[in-house]
């Protein structure tokens, strides 16, 4: 009886898996800090239609983002959320903070299309949110902590 051969498929799958793992879900542009990218993706004091708001994000990442949430408050208010008590994030890090109450927000969900013609449905709601916060980097506002990731809408 001949020994079993692994063949090329497991190696190919491994290489493809490694390639996919290198592509972040929401790749930050190189010329922005994490906080600046957070602001671009999620802070929208005056509500705007998903089509135009998501077009602004797509021009940086050059693909249609599946889901995005916009917080309708100034960056300074979101940064204030970073001063609330630390809680665990979805990834179990302890640098998350929950907003003090429900806030106006818009969720944009991809329905069809390919970049640059992405189509979204929008959902408006008032809900608390959780953000991950880190110390500011050079070029960030001078808050003790700045938001860098929208972890969850509660």
UniProtKB/Swiss-Prot annotation:
One of its GO terms (cellular component) is extracellular space. Residues 1-27 form the signal peptide. Gene3D superfamilies: Ribonuclease A-like domain. The active site is at residues 42, 149. Keywords: Disulfide bond, Endonuclease, Hydrolase, Nuclease, Secreted, Signal. Has a low ribonuclease activity. This is Ribonuclease 8. The lineage of its organism: Eukaryota, Metazoa, Chordata, Craniata, Vertebrata.
